[in-house]
């Protein structure tokens, strides 16, 4: 079906929220509830792990147009019109909406992203993995301006780019908090626990995004996303560490001037802007208080200790499905770390190992199946690496650090 962003006759925009029970989804519903004159929820989709939250959302919004991926969870709730692995995609295809917020986690968001673009609805994209994995496939499906980013960094870039024309842009600068391990050495990272990796210093996010931020993989994904969204070459996309997370991104222009977007860390601001784009939502978040003394720090990223960003850049330059390989390898390695099967440095070590062997995937995808094949290959390769490292760890229980040394070997490959 063909949708538009004209909204209802009363001017309200009809919004479908995918990933409604997650961090971004719950905050988006708060923004919508606070602005009933601007937005109306017309569909919800969730995995099914947080049924109490979903039931509460159904009661609060009155929405019965709901998708749940987990079949058993859908049966427990009852009266769920869309259920199963393709539930979110079918919900998008069958719902008249002006905006689809894709806040699903991981590359499983690819088909819903493509479905949303096909309907003509504006895609408020928090699920960066679908763009990273789909790459040119997603870009070909989108009309100009149809994708509006939800990530704070890309929302900031979109705002800053209003200050000049495309040919006036010299470079884009993404900021990174540095995560919970800023300033740590490679040796320090050998002993990181999932609990430590789940404690972000400035942002409140879901567990996978928090872990990806700790490893700096999230920033690597954002570099790829920046290139795809704004068409700027990788060698003109910089990353700088800014621990306070007040400046979210900057654009430097050819005359030497730099425009930055600043606001306290609150995802409701970029969420509200993506929902209402190009109009802002009054009172979406608190503004900076310049009457209170503060200092903003900037420092270079230590790419030796945190090589994930440079690996992402290499995958992006290689092109084709290599960014899908990067993302899929990370998803498998991150899950293994959270399960206690590998050490923290091994996450990026496995990504490096998989990319090193992935030359065959440096071709542009023609179909979704091409992307899925690349991801399947990367997952299987990563799983073999995890199994090998776990075997080394078991065989070397009397030799602490053996698994970590194996991870370092992979990282250098």
From Swiss-Prot:
Keywords assigned by UniProt, alphabetized: Isoprene biosynthesis, Manganese, Metal-binding, NADP, Oxidoreductase
The protein's Enzyme Commission number: 1.1.1.267
Claim: NADP is one of the keywords in the record: yes
Gene from which this protein is expressed: dxr
SUPFAM superfamilies registered for this protein in UniProt: 1-deoxy-D-xylulose-5-phosphate reductoisomerase, C-terminal domain (SSF69055), Glyceraldehyde-3-phosphate dehydrogenase-like, C-terminal domain (SSF55347), NAD(P)-binding Rossmann-fold domains (SSF51735)
Source species, domain of life: Bacteria
Name of the protein: 1-deoxy-D-xylulose 5-phosphate reductoisomerase
Catalysed reactions, as listed in the record: 2-C-methyl-D-erythritol 4-phosphate + NADP(+) = 1-deoxy-D-xylulose 5-phosphate + NADPH + H(+)
